[in-house]
Amino acid sequence: MAELTLSINFTQPIIHRELIRILSPAYQLMPGDTLNLTIALSNSMVHSDSLLIVASAINHLRSNGIEVLITIHGQSTYASRINFYSLIGVPFQENYIRRNNAGRFIELKSFDRDTLYPLQDELNMILYQNGGINKEVLQLLFYCLGEIMDNIIVHSGLDGGWVSAQYYPNRQEIRLTICDNGNGIHHSLTTHPESKYKQASEAEALDLCIQRGVTNGEGLGFGLFATSQFILKNDGDLLIYSGNHYLLATHGNYEIHEGDFYKGTLVSLRINTDVPVDYKDIMPAHHTLPDDYDFFIDKYFGEDNELW
């Protein structure tokens, strides 16, 4: 049986692509193999989406019969508060009072068909309650969040995925990451019997997935198109990582690069909460997005009362 040793240092800034580079060799392990993983933490801010990438990978490996032995150096009350320790099976004594998330974040969570829509509602309610986020941003995020999470249920070949969200009011930004360890975009796009894109390469599949109307035969092929257009017009950042390639959209443009292997699909967004985007620049004519969002708000909060 093989044994692999890896180390992640969260006491220094680390981007998602670097995390994937570190974790990539673990996806080659076989049932019965062992991963010795050392994680360095501190109470300086670590992003929840970075912790999500690690927690989801650990759970994936364990579910496939790989023994994951974890050593933690240092500690992070923030990591504990968003349930990182419990998700990776490491005991942690919480010497603090767990306060409400104050509409700033959700704990790291997995979701499946049964919890998909309640979790979407929870995320949208948290963002609405802050009151400091542009309404046009909230409307498009409401749509894109549902589409991305639904894509995982439909296309990953698994029962569900993982999500993290954090709002930074001082920076006027939201960081949102949704991921799974399933089939990946290339497999989904090229192997479905009704797909028109069976000859696409992995890099081409990433490019195709953000084009309007591209689908493997399931769905309308609009969710990632709308998401990418939203981020480009919002001047935010978008990372879509699947297999050995990733798409990076930033500063109004996007590029596709070859990278280290990631098992499944990762969609990570950084959204500027003060940069409005007109839904009519993205959505089909006569789309009911504003009405759909207002209906959602009325459902949970009663009349909007012109808070906006």
Which ranges hold each PLM region?
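Conserved short strand/loop->alpha-helix "switch" segment adjacent to the catalytic nucleotide/phosphoryl-transfer site
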Residues: M45, L123-G146
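Amphipathic alpha-helical interaction surfaces in cytosolic regulatory modules
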Residues: N9-G89
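Helix-loop-beta hinge of the Bergerat
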Residues: G103-I133, H192-R212, Q229
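Acidic ATP/Mg2+-coordinating residue in the GHKL
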Residues: D180
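Conserved ATP-binding N-box helix of the HATPase_c
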Residues: A55-A57, K135-N170, S228-F230
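Flexible, glycine-/charge-rich segments associated with ATP-binding catalytic modules
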Residues: M1-M30, G89, E94-I97, Y197, ...
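Short beta-strand element(s) in the Bergerat
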Residues: Q172-L176, T265
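Glycine-rich G1-box
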Residues: N183
